Design a protein with these regions (language model features):
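Class I S-adenosyl-L-methionine-dependent methyltransferase catalytic core
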Residues: 1-178
Length: 178
């Protein structure tokens, strides 16, 4: 895994082998970031199930102002810290906690939110409900959902899907406030 473009282009990212997780592959990440490019510059990013920090770090490389990288797994947090330190990124906050607690307590608004939980979970629907309940998405912001099953990407009537893509065993849906 590596950073595919921007100021950190070509920098290697460490991954990990934790059951139920799988990082977004470089070719899928490249396609995704081509789609969301107009939302990245100067954005405040929340990568809620950050894993290795892959998506949040890519957003920072492509011009995001600040990123919050969240994961509840300590192995993921250690990997994120290693990746951030190896690249020398400073405009990032790494949070080791459960997504529900983070969404309740963070009290920020985001321009770009990544929801890429482990495939064996059903966290997307609850995450979207909490993002809406706590009003965490800026009016022009987007939520990027990734899952192995399109049926797991369930959202309230306050959001609409503006784009969806299928890449092998991955479904990516972009949501925007209505």
């Amino acid at each position: 895994m590596k950073v595919i473009s921007g100021k950190y282009k070509g920098r290697k990212l460490d991954g990990f082998d934790i059951d139920g997780t799988r990082p977004t592959m470089d070719r899928v990440k490249e396609s995704l970031f081509a789609i969301i490019q107009n939302y990245i510059s100067e954005s405040i990013v929340l990568d809620l199930f950050a894993g290795s920090g892959n998506l949040g770090i890519e957003a920072l490389s492509e011009g995001a102002k600040y990123a919050y990288l969240v994961d509840k797994n300590i192995k993921c947090i250690k990997t994120i810290k290693k990746n951030v330190n190896n690249i020398g990124i400073e405009n990032v906050k790494i949070i080791h906690n459960d997504y529900r607690k983070v969404l309740k307590d963070i009290n920020k608004k985001f321009d770009l939110i990544f929801l890429d939980p482990p495939y064996k979970t059903n966290c997307i629907e609850e995450s979207i409900k909490l993002i809406d309940e706590y009003n965490l998405l800026n009016d022009n912001g987007i939520i990027v959902c990734e899952s192995d099953n399109l049926d797991k990407i369930v959202y309230t009537d306050k959001f609409s899907a503006i784009r969806d893509r299928h890449y092998g065993d991955k479904y990516i849906v972009l949501l925007k406030k209505i």
